[in-house]
């Protein structure tokens, strides 16, 4: 039997990532983005927007994330895609629709394309909870980037399973 695992050491061929970031609740999403960038940079990824390893795509809100993510995934240019957003419960059912559709859309893209898509859309009851998860207590953006690094590495390690 073979054991496959992702690695956090820089690969021989550099990874390419796309980050899809929702502008809505940007107070939160910009902090998540900062956490992602910090993690990627500390793991040898060039996070400069003018560089060749990370592309940044801003969308209006979390509902629009799956559409853009799918376009990126089918392009075949990325080892992993990180989706960042924040959906905060309000007084209407809008939260349920946006959060549910974003989650379903993102999950479908990963399974349909074989490209790791990291679900980094916070779903919280309050802005305070979102801010705690985006930097006050810890920054989930760091964890989303770690997931992307591990999955990109794992998919490369498993590539021989789909060849020839």
UniProtKB/Swiss-Prot annotation:
Organism whose genome encodes this protein: Synechocystis sp. (strain ATCC 27184 / PCC 6803 / Kazusa)
Entry GO MF terms: 6,7-dimethyl-8-ribityllumazine synthase activity
Annotated EC: 2.5.1.78
CDD domains: Lumazine_synthase-I
Annotated metabolic or biological route of this protein: Cofactor biosynthesis; riboflavin biosynthesis; riboflavin from 2-hydroxy-3-oxobutyl phosphate and 5-amino-6-(D-ribitylamino)uracil: step 1/2
Gene name for this UniProt entry: ribH
Name the UniProt record assigns to this protein: 6,7-dimethyl-8-ribityllumazine synthase
Single GO cellular component term: riboflavin synthase complex
Family that this chain belongs to: Belongs to the DMRL synthase family.
Residues the record lists as binding 5-amino-6-(D-ribitylamino)uracil: 24, 62-64, 86-88, 119
Catalytic activity: (2S)-2-hydroxy-3-oxobutyl phosphate + 5-amino-6-(D-ribitylamino)uracil = 6,7-dimethyl-8-(1-D-ribityl)lumazine + phosphate + 2 H2O + H(+)
